[in-house]
Amino acid sequence: MTVRVAINGFGRIGRNVVRALYESGRRAEITVVAINELADAAGMAHLLKYDTSHGRFAWEVRQERDQLFVGDDAIRVLHERSLQSLPWRELGVDVVLDCTGVYGSREHGEAHIAAGAKKVLFSHPGSNDLDTTVVYGVNQDQLRAEHRIVSNASCTTNCIIPVIKLLDDAYGIESGTVTTIHSAMHDQQVIDAYHPDLRRTRAASQSIIPVDTKLAAGITRFFPQFNDRFEAIAVRVPTINVTAIDLSVTVKKPVKANEVNLLLQKAAQGAFHGIVDYAELPLVSVDFNHDPHSAIVDGTQTRVSGAHLIKTLVWCDNEWGFANRMLDTTLAMATVAFR
């Protein structure tokens, strides 16, 4: 069965989902039947074809009236502001990938369902009343047919949750802190300009900028036992893609740095293959651009202090890795719903 997908919002994640679908060779499993985006179709086609972070798209892209063509595949283009007015029933949509970054409540998900979609997957953390939140590689096996409105969490949650799970299962985590070192995003300014967050009034290319993060809440959503025992801070840095996460945890069992690395390396080669990778080369952030893994552990940066404090550095392509997980979760949702 081929899953019929519609994409709502054709920004960074929406476009990368389409690129990842074609580059990963999964068109027999997923077909994009429609994209809803308020921008004009010519601009959509141009930004799909030419991307500053990921280069030229290898597939031919063209726009004709209300259709976007990728190769010979026609995708209907919509410019609808009202979720309730979207023609999902007419188009036979199985799963809507809502990549707007704006919608994320149960009410928004129900609007897609009312318009005719069978399932909805949000590309960012949703409200607590969604059916479930998935970090693929960790809990997708808990998906059920009755789960209609789902969140794919965030890029940073997908990056750090697998590593936390591995360390907790092996050594027993007592508490932890996380620092996200995230590339600049669209909600920052090119030059100094007004923003409700005064730090984000400043030019993104000129400063390391602290921002608020809900990553600690995302961690405790998956690990309730860590409530009040994990904290997170975040800074934005003047790069356009790839993120690093500095993770520090105190653990119950004594451990050495080489043992931590061996654990994570074996996981990357085994149970978490394709989700977690492990590297010991002297690499920098740009080397992880277009990497499809959720997390790449930098073994050169692992430290252990006093046998119980572990520090690790984990990389991710916050666009490309997450877009690939959107596809994985879509297939997982369809498998349990339509088998």
Swiss-Prot record:
GO terms for biological process: pyridoxal phosphate biosynthetic process; pyridoxine biosynthetic process. Keywords: Cytoplasm, NAD, Oxidoreductase, Pyridoxine biosynthesis. Pathway: Cofactor biosynthesis; pyridoxine 5'-phosphate biosynthesis; pyridoxine 5'-phosphate from D-erythrose 4-phosphate: step 1/5. The record marks 182 as: Activates thiol group during catalysis. It comes from the Bacteria. It catalyses: D-erythrose 4-phosphate + NAD(+) + H2O = 4-phospho-D-erythronate + NADH + 2 H(+). One of its GO terms (molecular function) is erythrose-4-phosphate dehydrogenase activity. The active site is at 155 (nucleophile). CDD domains: GAPDH_C_E4PDH, GAPDH_N_E4PDH. Substrate binds at residues 154-156, 200, 213-214, 236. Its main location: cytoplasm. NAD(+) binds at residues 12-13, 81, 318. Its EC number is 1.2.1.72. Homotetramer. NCBIfam families: E4PD_g-proteo, PRK13535.1. Catalyzes the NAD-dependent conversion of D-erythrose 4-phosphate to 4-phosphoerythronate. This is D-erythrose-4-phosphate dehydrogenase. The gene is epd.
